Amino acid sequence: VVSRLPAGQLAGQRIVLGFAGTRLPAAVERMIRAGEIAGVVFFADNLPSRSAGRRLIRRLQAPPRPPGLRDPLLAMTDQEGGLVKRIDGAPTVSARTMGARGAAFSADQGRRAAADLRRVGINVDLAPVLDVARPGGTIADANRGFGSTAAEVAASAVPFAAALQGGGVATTGKHFPGLGSARLNTDDAVQRIDLSKSTLREVDEAPYRRFVEAGGDVVMLSTAVYPALSPQPAAFSSQIATGELRERLGFKGVSITDALDTVAVRSFGGPAKVATAAARAGTDLLLYTDPTEAAKAQRALLHALRTSTISRASSEESVQRVLSLRHDLSQSG
C-alpha cells in the first residue's frame, strides 16, 4: 500500500493533531478525507463527558478515506491516572500509587482503563510514563512515575501496558530516553538532561527495554536535549530516535514525538524546520495540538519529499509501521 500512496498522503500519515472543543473542525475533516492525517489526540476539553467524547470520535471516524487508508484513525489521549487523565474512570490512582501497589494491581488498572477508553472510542493511550523519577523532578513531583529505580518502573508499568493491550488499546512508553530528572515541563522550557551516557543507558532507558521486549506498541520521544547522546533534542536526533531506540533497544513499533507546537520547541525553529528534522531523524509520527501547525507540518513534509530532503524509502518505512498499527487496532476489541 505505502508504495502507491501519493506524496501528500505519505506526508500526512506521519501527522497526529489536536483541536479545541467537541466539534470536528471542517479543516480537520478535509485532511481526513484527503488522507493527510494518521490520527487525533484528545484533551479534556474534547471529552467533557464519555457520551460527548463518543459522539466526537464517531464523527472523526465517519468520513470516507482514500484507498489503503480506510482503517480507523489513531484516536489518542493521555490516560495515565492521577493528575494526567482525560476521561473519568481508570486508572483511579496515580502511576506512583500503582508502582507502590505492584504488578497485579497495575494490571487490573490497565484492564479497567482499556475498557473505559474503548467505550469512548480511544484506541491509543499515551501511557505509561516509563521515566525513572528522581527527587525534585517534575515526574516525581506530579506522581507520574511508577518508581525511582528502573526495576520499580518496569515491574508495574509493563504489566499495566500489557493489560491495556489485552483490552484492545495500544500503549505508549514515554518520554524516551527519559525525563525522570527534568526539573521543568518540556512544553514550557528547553530541558537539558545532563546525565552520563552510561546512566542514560543503564538506568533511564532500562524500563524502555523491558517495554520493547514485552511488545509495547508506541514510544514517545522527548523534546529535551541529552548532550551525552546528541546535541539535538531526542525527537530530532537520529542518534536517539534511530540509534538508541531502534538499533540499540530493537524497537520495531511506532515512534512519536512529544508535542511540537510548544514554546520550548519553537526555540529550535519554525514548524517546517522542526517537522523536517523530526522526520529525518526517523521519528514516525509528529504530534501537534494545533491543527493549523499540523497542516504546516504536513506541507513541509510534502515539500521535503518532493525535494528529496527526506527520502521516499524512509518515509514508507515509517508509514508502514503507522498503517500496521492502525490495522492491528481495527482487528482488536
Residue ranges and their predicted role:
Residues 1-86:
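N-terminal hydrophobic targeting/anchoring segments and the immediately downstream early-domain regions
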Residues 6, 27, 48-67, 151-310:
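Second-shell residues forming the walls of enzyme active-site clefts
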Residues 12-19, 38-42, 71-79, 124-128, ...:
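Hydrophobic faces of well-ordered beta-strands that scaffold small-molecule active sites
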Residues 61-91, 106-132, 153-177:
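Glycine-rich, aromatic-flanked loop segments that form ligand/cofactor-binding clefts
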Residues 91-103, 146-147:
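A charged helix-plus-loop insertion that forms the helical arch/lid used to bind
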Residues 93, 124-146, 171-194:
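Short glycine/serine-rich loop/turn segments
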Residues 303, 308-333:
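Mid-to-C-terminal alpha-helical segments outside catalytic/metal-binding sites
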